[in-house]
């Protein structure tokens, strides 16, 4: 039995998220279906980070076990031929049998893309959040400092979050302006349900100068979801990287746009 690692990219619009659901198509379902056909046996996959409905990935990492006699090229080319256009395998390699794409990971990286322009773009509409008002990035980055470290993120978790603990460790949270794009990059050991999109909703209020950077500190201390702003839309969020003890994968979204 061999253990295979896949690096995959997907456009999340037409899917109910990563996880298999009975009522709607999912990334997991499509990938397992294609792999199972190539292997001629049932294949189950594990991913580094389960994304929600409408969220995209440029560098999701998946692993699966199989004893099917296939070389790496056959796995990749055959599976890609069966996958829908919105999901593709970028790379494949064999890894140790004890490797688990979820539990072996040490941290995960997400990007949230904001198109900050007076006029919206029809082409970019499904790929990033449009904000026509000018954002104060300096103040947004001042607020980001309060998100760093290991702390209780109750104020930024959804009511449907199933995690046993609200504590997470955020190693990086930063906005970078690249032309008309504003890219939020956040790195953490793991994330709560809707956590990043809830960050964005509140940080936008600061960028629009409705709140001060210090307001984020008060929201965190309240440990109350109702004290934070509304959840930002899903289509601006991308899973872009994951780090393991021996290797890492990362493809920033802006590299695809520029």
Swiss-Prot record:
It comes from Francisella philomiragia subsp. philomiragia (strain ATCC 25017 / CCUG 19701 / FSC 153 / O#319-036). Substrate binds at residue 110. Homodimer. The keyword Oxidoreductase does not apply. One of its GO terms (biological process) is tRNA pseudouridine synthesis. One of its GO terms (molecular function) is RNA binding. Its EC number is 5.4.99.12. The active site is at residue 52. The gene is truA. Formation of pseudouridine at positions 38, 39 and 40 in the anticodon stem and loop of transfer RNAs. It catalyses: uridine(38/39/40) in tRNA = pseudouridine(38/39/40) in tRNA. Keywords: Isomerase, tRNA processing. It comes from the Bacteria. InterPro entries: PsdUridine_synth_cat_dom_sf, PsdUridine_synth_TruA, PsdUridine_synth_TruA_a/b_dom, PsdUridine_synth_TruA_C, TruA/RsuA/RluB/E/F_N. Pfam families: PseudoU_synth_1. This is tRNA pseudouridine synthase A. The keyword Isomerase applies. Belongs to the tRNA pseudouridine synthase TruA family.
């Amino acid at each position: 039995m061999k253990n295979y690692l896949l690096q995959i990219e997907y456009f999340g619009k037409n899917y109910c998220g990563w996880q298999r659901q009975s009522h709607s198509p999912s990334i997991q379902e499509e990938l397992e279906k294609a792999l199972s056909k190539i292997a001629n046996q049932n294949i189950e996959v594990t991913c580094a980070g389960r994304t929600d409905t409408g969220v995209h990935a440029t560098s999701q990492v998946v692993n699966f076990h199989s004893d099917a006699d296939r070389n790496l090229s056959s796995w990749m080319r055959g599976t890609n031929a069966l996958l829908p256009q919105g999901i593709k395998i970028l790379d494949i390699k064999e890894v140790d049998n004890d490797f688990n794409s979820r539990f072996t990971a040490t941290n995960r990286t997400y990007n949230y893309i904001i198109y900050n322009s007076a006029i919206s773009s029809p082409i970019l509409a499904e790929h990033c959040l449009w904000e026509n008002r000018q954002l104060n990035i300096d103040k947004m980055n001042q607020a980001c400092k309060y998100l760093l470290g290991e702390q209780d993120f109750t104020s930024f978790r959804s009511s449907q979050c199933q995690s046993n603990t609200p504590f997470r460790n955020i190693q990086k949270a930063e906005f970078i302006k690249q032309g008309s794009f504003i890219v939020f990059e956040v790195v953490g050991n793991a994330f709560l349900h809707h956590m990043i999109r809830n960050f964005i909703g509140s940080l936008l209020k600061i960028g629009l100068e409705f709140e001060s950077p210090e307001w984020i500190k008060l929201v965190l201390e309240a440990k109350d979801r109702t004290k934070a702003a509304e959840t930002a839309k899903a289509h601006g969020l991308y899973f872009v990287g994951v780090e393991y003890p021996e290797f890492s994968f990362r493809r920033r979204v802006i590299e695809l746009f520029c």
